[in-house]
Structure formats: structure tokens, C-alpha cells
């Protein structure tokens, strides 16, 4: 992704060299994303239908969460708006007045994305509707084979002048004067020098940590899962336009449908459950037969103390790790690339640019961290030691403030460029039974019948829109079917 974006932005004015090794494996079981990736691909000039075909992808309206608030609960966290603002207040405040008195359905009934996901419907947009129609543009993301996407972008990059070298980096040479990276040495002895080095070496942090000793902030006390067991399985039935996250005894299980198979995994805390028990649970909860042996990935949730150190910028897993609960992994890669392009240095490497990059990246990681913690903390589950810990742990103060504000009267304020906006917080809080005790007092200034009609009209418009949408499978079959394997 970094090579493709830099090649598109800088053209052939800068020499870009990509060093990677096919011998270093990846956990290729399917990747779930957020809508920002559509903009990234569009900036590269990639056709959406062609992209989905090449990566054997499906479309995503959001995530279904099962058993998180209580055993038996399920709700959707989707990408689109909830209703529409009325006056100066968000829709959910009017809905909340009726909901608290038993006169409205769950919040998902007022989200086009949620209703469409439940019914297996999908479309990207409609050309014959007014701009205020929910169908004018349907925010969406993708579910795809990450390995195929990487190969697709590799070809894209090489076609635009990126020089690819197959090999492993075995040594890093630092300048004696300032400790900047001068060159990397490959297995065969070849040396590659450069001005700026981007570390995409994953958890190892080959440059940012092993060479520059940047340091790492461990967040395991808030997000205790430290392993994932992943396995692909055969496709059974229509692919859903959403990812599923099912809470388990010591973590959660993902299900990501692709056109040709399904990606599955159990993210868990090794402190509370054994690998053998995870294996039994995962393998007994697959839709179809496993297509490979499960693989275990070990990780420590957290981030580098600096994302940009000297002349090295860490991108992706080299910069930090967030479990894939809200599918933020590729987003964080994309965001890091965009930030680097905006703050691209000259050979002087101004400390002002580096400092701003690090501050913005730290803010982004910490706000996403808090949103993930919310899922574990906002629960009534106490049925296992894992959930007993999560439901009673000390949480970051800003998250605690957000929860108190929402539970008081359903309010939330987004900070600056924080990734997750009001609809996300409303859906997760309500979905996991953190219900406000009251609504905004200004709602009472609107006649109750007007509130009833507003809420009902949103529900009715969504129902009519979903009715005319094709099924997810029909949409893929018409516009972007992958070639048979």
C-alpha cells in the first residue's frame, strides 16, 4: 500500500525500492475493512468492480456483534447514518425519547445499513433517486483476501516505477553522526542505501525497533487478548454483506465471508484459556469444512513510542497492533501513509514534521484503543473470569468520561479527527445495553406527535429502500464476480 501510494503521488521523481520476501508468511484468512479504503483505491485510480473481482472480495455494511452485552444478544455496528438530524439535534435523541417509553424499536431499525445487512441486501448507489435518498450513496467497505490485494498493489507499484527486490534484510547500518539509517543489508550481501526508510516488517519492527530501539507501549491491561487462531473454511450459503464478531469465553470469534471461502479466527487471552480449548471452540463453530490447519498469531496490543524515529517511519504492524475487532488494521496503514505524504520531508528531516506526525498518530491509536475497550467494558457478562475482568477493569479516563456523558443523556462529542463518530458510539453503547437515563431536554420542545411522525417516517423510508435493493449475491454476480478458482 505504501509503495503504491508513494508511486502515485511522487511519480518517478523519487526512486522507490520495495524489499520483501516470499519466504515470510502471512495469515491469509480474509481481511475486513472500513469505508476509508474505497477512497484510497479511488485515489490510486483503481476501478472498484475490477478490484473486488481480483481480490475475490465481498462488500461490507458493518459488523454483527453476537453475545457481547449478554449471551443471546445481537446488534449491528454499521457504517451509515442513523436516521437524519432534525433541527439542531441528532436523530437518536428524538428516537431515545420514544424508546425510553417503549414506543420505538431498537436503534438498528432506523439504520438503512443495519436493516439491509439483516436481510442480505446490498448496493453501492442508485442513479435515479434524489440526493437526499438513503440510496444515493451507500457507505460500504470490503471483505477480501489480503494476500491477493498485496499482489495486486505490487503489480500496480511496479508498473509505476517501483523497483522490487526479493530478499531478507539481515543488517541495518546507522550513520555515526546522527544515528540515522544509512543502508540495509540483504541476505546475499547486497546493500541498499536511501534517504527515507519505511518499516513495514510487521511485529518484528526490523528498523524501528531492532535497529533504532524506539520502545513500545503495552496496552494488554486494557485489551487482554494476546493471541489469535485463524483458519479458512469452505463457503456455505450466500456471502453476507457484513463481518460477524461472536463473543466467546475468553475473547471473540470473527467470520469474514469472501466470494470463494470464509475467513475465521478466535482472538483470545492466553491467560484465561488454553490453545487446545480455543482450537476446539473455533473448529466446532465453522460454517463449512476447514481448508487448512489453524495457525496461531501471537501479539502484544499497543504502539511504538514513536512512529517516526529519525529517518524511519513505521507503517502497519511495525507501528503497533490493534486487534481486528473493528477492522482498523488496513485503515491504520492507509492513515499512516496519508499522514506521511502530507508531512513528506526533504533531506533535512525537519523535527517539526516528525513531531506532528507522531502526535497525530498517537492520538489516532489512542482513540481507536478506547473504542475497542468500550466493547469489552460495556457488558453485563460475568460468566467467565475473562469477562469478569473486562467488565470491572479500570479504563482510560477519557473513555470513562465519554461513557458517563452518554449514559447520562445520550450525548457524545467527537475529538478532532477521531476515527469513530457519533453513530458508531450510539450503536455500540445501545447494542451493549449502556442505555441513557434520559434524552436531550430540547426534544420536549417539539410536539410529541411530530417526534412520533419523524421516527416513523425514517423507519418507513428505510423499509421501502431496502425492499428495492438487490441481494448481496445478486449485486456481486452482476458487477464483480471473481473468476473460478
Per-segment meaning from a language model:
Residues 302-367:
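Conserved mid-domain beta->alpha element of the FAD-binding
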Residues 4-15, 134, 147-151, 476-485:
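Extreme N-terminal leader/targeting segments of oxidoreductases
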Residues 248-300, 318-332, 343-347:
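Conserved FAD/dinucleotide-binding core of flavoprotein oxidoreductases
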Residues 5, 130-282, 337:
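Predominantly flavin-linked oxidoreductase catalytic cores and closely associated redox partners
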Residues 5-31:
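Glycine-rich FAD pyrophosphate-binding loop
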Residues 29-118:
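Dinucleotide-binding Rossmann-like beta1-alpha1 core, especially the glycine-rich loop
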Residues 342-485:
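Long, low-complexity C-terminal extensions of enzymes
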Residues 105-144:
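Alpha-helix-centered segments that form part of catalytic cores
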Amino acid at each position: 500500500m505504501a509503495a503504491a501510494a508513494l508511486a502515485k503521488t511522487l511519480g518517478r521523481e523519487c526512486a522507490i525500492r520495495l524489499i520483501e520476501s516470499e519466504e515470510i508468511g502471512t495469515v491469509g484468512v480474509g481481511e475486513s475493512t472500513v469505508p476509508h479504503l474505497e477512497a484510497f483505491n479511488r485515489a490510486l485510480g483503481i476501478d472498484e468492480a475490477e478490484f473486488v473481482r481480483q481480490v475475490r472480495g465481498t462488500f461490507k455494511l458493518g459488523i454483527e456483534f453476537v453475545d457481547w452485552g449478554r449471551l443471546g444478544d445481537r446488534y449491528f455496528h454499521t457504517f451509515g447514518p442513523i436516521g437524519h438530524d432534525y433541527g439542531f439535534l441528532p436523530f437518536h435523541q428524538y428516537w431515545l425519547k420514544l424508546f425510553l417509553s417503549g414506543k420505538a424499536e431498537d436503534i438498528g431499525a432506523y439504520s438503512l445499513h443495519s436493516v439491509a445487512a439483516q436481510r442480505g441486501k446490498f448496493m453501492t448507489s442508485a442513479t435515479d433517486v434524489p440526493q437526499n435518498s438513503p440510496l444515493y450513496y451507500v457507505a460500504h467497505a470490503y471483505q477480501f483476501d489480503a494476500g491477493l490485494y498485496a499482489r495486486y498493489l505490487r503489480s500496480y507499484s511496479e508498473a509505476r516505477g517501483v523497483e522490487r527486490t526479493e530478499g531478507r534484510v539481515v543488517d541495518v547500518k546507522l550513520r555515526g553522526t546522527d544515528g540515522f539509517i544509512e543502508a540495509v543489508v540483504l541476505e546475499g550481501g547486497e546493500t541498499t542505501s536511501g534517504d527515507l526508510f519505511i518499516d513495514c516488517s510487521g511485529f518484528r519492527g526490523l528498523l524501528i525497533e531492532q535497529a533504532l530501539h524506539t520502545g513500545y507501549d503495552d496496552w494488554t491491561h486494557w485489551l487482554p487478548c494476546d493471541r489469535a487462531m485463524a483458519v479458512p473454511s469452505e463457503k456455505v450459503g450466500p456471502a453476507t454483506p457484513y463481518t460477524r464478531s461472536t463473543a466467546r469465553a475468553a475473547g471473540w470469534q470473527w467470520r469474514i465471508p469472501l466470494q470463494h471461502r470464509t475467513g475465521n479466527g478466535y482472538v483470545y487471552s492466553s491467560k484465561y484459556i488454553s490453545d487446545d480449548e480455543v482450537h476446539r471452540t473455533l473448529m466446532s463453530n465453522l460454517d463449512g469444512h476447514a481448508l487448512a490447519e489453524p495457525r496461531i498469531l501471537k501479539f502484544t496490543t499497543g504502539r511504538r513510542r514513536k512512529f517516526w524515529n529519525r529517518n524511519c517511519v513505521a507503517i502497519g504492524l511495525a507501528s503497533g497492533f490493534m486487534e481486528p475487532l473493528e477492522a482498523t488494521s488496513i485503515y491504520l496503514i492507509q492513515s499512516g501513509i496519508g499522514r506521511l505524504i502530507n508531512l513528506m520531508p526533504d533531506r533535512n528531516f525537519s523535527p517539526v514534521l516528525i513531531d506532528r506526525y507522531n502526535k497525530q498518530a498517537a492520538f489516532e491509536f489512542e482513540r481507536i484503543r478506547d473504542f475497542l475497550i468500550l466493547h469489552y467494558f460495556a457488558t453485563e457478562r460475568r460468566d467467565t473470569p475473562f469477562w469478569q475482568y473486562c467488565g470491572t477493569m479500570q479504563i482510560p479516563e477519557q473513555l470513562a468520561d465519554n461513557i458517563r456523558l452518554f449514559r447520562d443523556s445520550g450525548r457524545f462529542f467527537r475529538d478532532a479527527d477521531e476515527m469513530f463518530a457519533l453513530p458508531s458510539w450510539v450503536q455500540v453503547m445501545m447494542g451493549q445495553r449502556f442505555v441513557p437515563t434520559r434524552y436531550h431536554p430540547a426534544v420536549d420542545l417539539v410536539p410529541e406527535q411530530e417526534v412520533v411522525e419523524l421516527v416513523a417516517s425514517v423507519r418507513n423510508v428505510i423499509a421501502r429502500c431496502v425492499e428495492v435493493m438487490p441481494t448481496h449475491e445478486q449485486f456481486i454476480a452482476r458487477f464483480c464476480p471473481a473468476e473460478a478458482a
